[in-house]
Amino acid sequence: MGNRGVLIGSIVFVFGSFILMVSLLLYESYKANKMKALAASIKTEARSTSSSVPSMDYSMYKTKISDEGREMVQVPEGPFIMGSKDGDPDEVPERQTYLKAFYIDTKEVSQEDYARFAKMTKRPLPKIEVFEDDQSKLLRPEFAAMSMTWDEAVAYCKWAGKRLPTEAEWEKAGRGEGKRKYAWGDTFMSGRANANVDGSEDGFRYLAPPGSFETGRSPYGIYDMTGNVAEWVADSYDEHYYQKAPYRDPKGPEPGELKVVRGGSWRETQHNARLSKRFAAKLWRTDITIGFRCASDVEVVDSPTASK
């Protein structure tokens, strides 16, 4: 009986061990399948999230490379809505404006672009007058050019065979034919512009390289019309100009020392980042939040100056 008891005990032990091992294997298989299912659901969610921001096709709009090597897009002739009935007093009345076709830079002028111009024309680089942090954080070749006067922006565009856009051209390039508040629509969305309205959620503390926000492009595929640097335009500033502006191709009031700045900047509020928002600045002002881009008439052949 003693040996028989030992044998039975051994059989029970072996059988129990087998059952335990099978149970562990089944549990591990269950965990593995569950992890695979979780991974699959994460991938599906990621695809769903990315597909919620549809890829826009801008190929319908004609582009060209200007003489200084920068891409421009042709904004077609036609009407658009300018101003805002819900904005500041100088944005009213909201009205329809008609523009002939024009070209505009798809990206803001970079510091590298401006440095090339300054070197070829023997001009000094813009100086940063006031900045609370290390200036090197603003000075990178790939960042947007800033801190130049209105006259210096005009000189760059002339050197490149272009001009500054009019205020109306700038607004149409940003809004399209409708009256959207921001380049992508009516609701401000983090990650679509370098505008630190909610801290640094856009990924940049100060400036950003022009063209960093693919989902923040305007209806014509133009980058940074909302945020990064505000931009000089050709027009002088008149608070009441919209009330007397012509329907076709408005070019602003009589020249004066106050010029219009558009687009908001990297440190603006949602209100100031709106495409209809108008700013006024003395033409000799230099500011780390102000840069520019250039435009040209469709029928004008760019000057060869910049390619020499």
Language model segments and positions:
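Short, structured beta-strand segments at or near domain termini in extracellular proteins/domains
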Residues: 288-302
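Intrinsically disordered, low-complexity segments enriched in small/polar and acidic residues
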Residues: 39-40, 74, 306
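A short, compositionally biased domain-edge/stem linker segment
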Residues: 54-68
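Short, P/G- and charge-enriched loop/turn segments at secondary-structure junctions
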Residues: 59-62, 89-93, 278-283
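Functional-site microenvironments in short loops/helix caps that host divalent-cation chemistry
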Residues: 81, 86, 124, 131-279, ...
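Ser/Thr/Pro/Gly-rich low-complexity linker/stalk segments immediately outside membranes or between
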Residues: 27-56
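N-terminal Sec-pathway targeting helices
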Residues: 1-15
